[in-house]
Amino acid sequence: MRLLWEEEAWEDYCLWQTRDKKLLKRINTLLKDIQRNTYEGTGKPEPLKGDLSGWWSRRIDVTHRIVYKEQDGNIIIASCFGHYSDT
């Protein structure tokens, strides 16, 4: 599956490249796992509710989450900084 980034999510990802290489590595590992197993695997995948119904999150660390959804064979990344309530 191909990764498609919302603009803010891509900016967050680029920020991680200069801010924290360890968390960037974790994000890259999670992204690969999402492409292989969209709804299972590392990072404790969980479906989101309410306004974010249809989206999923995975834990980068205690504070940060990747928020994504599968659509038309692609993975759309909405956020990779902060918590999904910040999205």
Residue ranges of model-derived segments:
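Residue-level signal for threonine
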Residues: 6
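Generic structural signal for secondary-structure transition and capping sites
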Residues: 36-39
